[in-house]
Curated annotation (Swiss-Prot):
Name of the protein: NADH-quinone oxidoreductase subunit H
NCBIfam families, per the entry: PRK06076.1-1, PRK06076.1-2
Topology relative to the membrane: Multi-pass membrane protein
Alphabetical GO biological process terms: aerobic respiration
Family classification: Belongs to the complex I subunit 1 family.
Substrates-to-products reaction catalysed: a quinone + NADH + 5 H(+)(in) = a quinol + NAD(+) + 4 H(+)(out)
Length: 335
């Protein structure tokens, strides 16, 4: 009897897809640090990294070697188990969240009916990594940064979820592929769910702790925040994890609001991966542009903005969407 039954082949293909996608995401996250430095230099009218290799292209290799050979030091006053666990949880939660992203009609790790809920579960898990890092470091700046990060992340995840409820109401599903196919038959959600898009994008920047919402690791205030005591590859996992978060939020924006792998007006459907990659790259550049152009507000202003602006906006968007869906739903006679 052959071991290669259709079920076994499906499992093998799923594992291969998962390995390829996760390796590609990790490599892209590492390369994104170099791309960001070059773009920031270009936009700010200065040189970026330009010494190592042609156009500074090997700078990322030099940085990785430096990080790899640095001493993996753990402070003697830290809780060593939790201190080591925190960067692992931070990076793995973001990588696992990529399982629900449909890159093309055939490429994706898992086609879950609760795809959106799975994403929020993994996003919530990353909050524990930040709390673990700040608490286990036994450092007042790290603890204050972790408390800032957890409060900010939990607050903006509320609005991130509410921003997507309008899409769920219209599609009637939490499945990511169902959402993409709905947009292929109708308008991309950037038009009917524009308020939801704005709130989701703002919340995405805040959840990834990117500028201008990088108060949890503000160098001028907290001396690098919750990962101040980290060095070597542990710090590198936090560092690369931040860029993986940028890629994840950008891919979600493309999937949920910009038609996923579909081109505009159904142009060149055979180039599904190219369309997905181009749209994701656009939002990644938008993240970097925000860092280059916007100052950092105070922490209390960030929290006030979340509850006084984002919450009313998401609730209004959800109410309008529900009213429109009910209006367009044909009445059913009660027997």
């Amino acid at each position: 009897m052959s071991w290669f039954t259709p079920e076994v082949i499906d499992v093998i293909l799923t594992v291969v897809k998962a390995i390829v996608i996760l390796l590609a995401v990790v490599i892209a996250g590492a390369l994104l640090s170099f791309v960001e430095r070059r773009l920031l230099g270009w936009w700010q009218d200065r040189y970026g990294p330009n010494r190592v290799g042609p156009f500074g292209m090997f700078q990322i290799a030099a940085d990785m070697l430096k990080m790899f050979f640095k001493e993996d030091w753990t402070p003697p006053f830290a809780d060593k188990v939790i201190f080591t666990l925190a960067p692992v949880v931070a990076m793995s939660a973001l990588l696992i969240a990529f399982a629900i992203i449909p890159i093309t009609p055939t490429w994706g790790v898992a086609d879950l009916n609760i795809g959106l809920l799975f994403f929020f579960a993994m996003a919530g898990l990353s909050v524990y990594a930040v709390l673990f890092a700040g608490w286990s470091s036994n450092n007042k700046f790290a603890l204050l940064g972790s408390l800032r990060a957890s409060a900010q992340t939990v607050s903006y995840e509320v609005f991130m979820g509410l921003a997507l409820m309008g899409i769920v109401v219209q599609v009637g599903s939490f499945n990511m592929r169902d959402i993409v196919e709905y947009q292929a038959q109708n308008l991309w959600f950037i038009i009917p769910q524009f308020f939801g898009f704005c709130t989701f994008f703002i919340a995405g920047v805040a959840v990834t702790h990117r500028h201008p919402f990088d108060q949890p690791e503000a160098e001028q205030e907290l001396a690098d925040g919750y990962h101040i005591e980290y060095a070597g590859m542990k710090w590198g996992m936090f560092f690369v994890g931040e860029y993986i978060g940028i890629i994840l939020i950008s891919a979600l924006l493309v999937t949920l609001f910009f038609g996923g792998w579909h081109g505009p007006f159904g142009i060149l459907p055979q180039l599904s991966f190219v369309w997905f990659a181009l749209k994701t790259a656009f939002f990644i550049m938008l993240f970097i542009l925000l860092r280059a152009s916007i100052p950092r507000p105070r922490y209390d202003q960030v929290m006030d903005f979340s509850w006084k602006f984002c919450l009313p906006l998401t609730l209004i968007n959800l109410l309008i969407t529900a009213a429109v869906v009910l209006w367009n739903t044909p009445a059913v006679a009660v027997q």
